[in-house]
Amino acid sequence: MSKDYFIGLMSGTSMDGVDAVLVQFSQGEATLVERHSQAIPKHTLSGLQRLCLPGSDEITRLGQLDRSVGLLFASAVNALLEKAGVSKEQVVAIGSHGQTVRHMPNLDMGFTLQIGDPNTIAVETGIDVIADFRRKDIALGGQGAPLVPAFHQQMFSKPDTNRIILNIGGISNVTYLPGNSQAVVGFDTGPGNTLIDAWIQQVKHEAYDKDGAWAASGETDEKLLMYLLSHSYFSMGFPKSTGRELFNQAWLEQQTAAFGHLSEADIQSTLLDVTCHSIAKDVLTLSADGELFVCGGGAFNRELMSRLHNLLPSYQIDSTASLGMNPQWVEGIAFAWLAMRHNQGLSGNLPAVTGASREAVLGSLFPAA
């Protein structure tokens, strides 16, 4: 029985579910064999959202959620294998990103923390797990993020063509793939779906703004837009990365407190423009024109995509589906790829992207045995 599959597990800052993908790699190409998305139970989601903000008794909650998320990830793997009709013996390793609960690389003693106990995943699935991908890069002086640009470079580069891969999850990040010999560049541009999700959850108790319809029904307030975009993160040079520690519901409430005269739909429209304008500014800083391919949940937001087209008329914009990779599963495939790189003793980071002092093999091995 051949053993040539890798599994990627990803749950992003939007916490909208666990993505599990079964992947085969051959001659530098990735084939998505099967995929599975598993919802995060409400009590686990509530605990994770609380843990992402300062509070009391965090260590006990952290320890328990670490196990709970590990069990959830393992359940996603087992469901994936059953759906694919593939046995655990055929899988080389699982690459698990985990669930980020803190990402603070710019402190004097910078750190990042993802939970979802890889020991639990290994025991519950019977498959070796490679996890903790980000902390080696931080130990080397880097941001620990974004890590997907190395994967984007291998899968999506095209000679003589400037390409940008834009991932819009909870946070948006870009990878610039120049068509010449320039170094690849990648960084977080700022909020992706996190603010528009937080606002619709607070006001309408809906998980997300389907197709951006609510935002489309409102009018952007230029004063609020400029106020939000004046945050220092948007003017920082790269490498840079961010997360829910900064752009969260508490921050949103504080920033919009003086704008109570606006309608709720107008605020939603303005928040969507924060995402789109911050992306467009950084994209144009990287290159005046080229091809832009979108992945992540934002690729399915019709209003968001329309606004990007309007802000970036010199770019050809499409989703990564046009490159043969479903935008929903790109990050999961990337962590299967990082597991494969670890297994082969190959580096997974790009120092030009993260600011690390050198390339390194990322992740730690947690054997099932």
UniProtKB/Swiss-Prot annotation:
E.C. code: 2.7.1.170
KW Cell inner membrane (keyword) present: no
GO process terms (BP): 1,6-anhydro-N-acetyl-beta-muramic acid catabolic process; amino sugar metabolic process; peptidoglycan turnover
Enzyme class: transferase
Biological role stated in the UniProt entry: Catalyzes the specific phosphorylation of 1,6-anhydro-N-acetylmuramic acid (anhMurNAc) with the simultaneous cleavage of the 1,6-anhydro ring, generating MurNAc-6-P. Is required for the utilization of anhMurNAc either imported from the medium or derived from its own cell wall murein, and thus plays a role in cell wall recycling.
Keyword ATP-binding: yes
Binding residues for ATP: G12, T13, S14, M15, D16, G17, V18, D19
Coiled coil: none
The protein's name in its UniProt record: Anhydro-N-acetylmuramic acid kinase
Catalysis: reaction(s): 1,6-anhydro-N-acetyl-beta-muramate + ATP + H2O = N-acetyl-D-muramate 6-phosphate + ADP + H(+)
GO molecular function, one term: ATP binding
Keyword terms of this UniProt record: ATP-binding, Carbohydrate metabolism, Kinase, Nucleotide-binding, Transferase
Family to which this protein belongs: Belongs to the anhydro-N-acetylmuramic acid kinase family.
Upper lineage: Bacteria, Pseudomonadati, Pseudomonadota, Gammaproteobacteria, Alteromonadales
InterPro entries linked: Anhydro_N_Ac-Mur_kinase, ATPase_NBD
Pathway of action: Amino-sugar metabolism; 1,6-anhydro-N-acetylmuramate degradation; Cell wall biogenesis; peptidoglycan recycling
